[in-house]
Regions:
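Proteins with a high burden of low-complexity, intrinsically disordered sequence enriched in S/T/G/P/A and R
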Residues: 1-9, 215-219, 236
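Radical SAM/AdoMet-radical enzyme domain recognition
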Residues: 1-102
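Glycine-centered flexibility motif
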Residues: 51, 59, 66, 108, ...
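Short, charge-patterned binding micro-sites
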Residues: 105
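Accessory C-terminal segments flanking Radical SAM cores
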Residues: 108-225
């Protein structure tokens, strides 16, 4: 069944890129969003709690060789990986990868603790630190972009998803499909739509049901700003 989607991307922690490379390439997927918070093996084990850094980096190189467009998502956290902010940008610029810094989100266990305030690293702080090492300028971004974009002349681009500093809820068009088949319309709303029943339908019925499901998911969006949720981000997808 052809869904008629104009754009689709995979969000992944990169652990299975090497193993699933053929399937990814054959699927026609052109874009990958890879979550990677550090280039330090020790910090990687501490933050990710599983997996292997070299496996992720090798997978990234393989996907680049295959011609896929890659964005890397990094969540800067004070007292954790804030010393990786500049090395990560240097790594990405040298490979033609756009790095997206994502402000720490008030979700999961952070929703009801002081850790969010303690670890939060703002867009202003990011730009001040990056400015000590790179010359950059703010650039225009598409209307529905979730990121504030910046250009490093002659080297590439980076972005900041500033959900706290500059909320983008009013222009957000994203829908997220989790690994267990649920579609989420908003990260500030734990409600989801179960897509699995559609998989057993005939094409015409499936297309109609899918359109209705996606419309319901869009109605779950809130436009007044990011308020956070107890749902853990890794179960939804970035």
């Amino acid at each position: 069944m052809k869904l008629g989607l104009k754009d689709a991307a995979i969000t992944t922690n990169g652990q299975l890129l090497l193993r699933k490379a053929d399937s990814i390439i054959e699927s026609g997927i052109k874009r990958l969003n890879i979550s990677l918070d550090t280039l330090d093996a020790g910090k990687f084990r501490s933050i990710a709690r599983s997996g292997d850094l070299e496996t992720v980096l090798s997978g990234i190189d393989l996907m680049l060789e295959a011609g896929l467009k890659i964005k890397i998502n990094m969540v800067p956290m004070r007292f954790s990986n804030d010393d990786q902010i500049v090395p990560m940008l240097d790594y990405c610029l040298s490979r033609g990868i756009e790095l997206r810094y994502i402000e720490l989100m008030n979700m999961g266990h952070l929703r009801s603790s002081n850790e969010f305030v303690r670890q939060f690293f703002s867009m202003e702080e990011l730009l001040e630190l990056i400015g000590q090492h790179f010359i950059f300028e703010r650039t225009n971004a598409p209307f529905d972009s979730t990121a504030v974009r910046f250009a490093v002349p002659g080297q590439g681009n980076f972005g900041i998803i500033a959900n706290e500093s500059e909320p983008f809820c009013k222009t957000c068009t994203r829908l997220r499909l989790s690994s267990n088949g649920h579609v989420y319309g908003c990260l500030s709303n734990a409600h989801s739509q179960d897509m699995k029943p559609i998989l057993g339908m005939q094409d015409l019925e499936a297309k109609d049901s899918l359109r209705q499901l996606l419309n319901r998911a869009r109605k779950d969006k809130q436009t007044h700003g990011f308020t956070g949720e107890v749902t853990v981000m890794k179960f939804i997808g970035g």
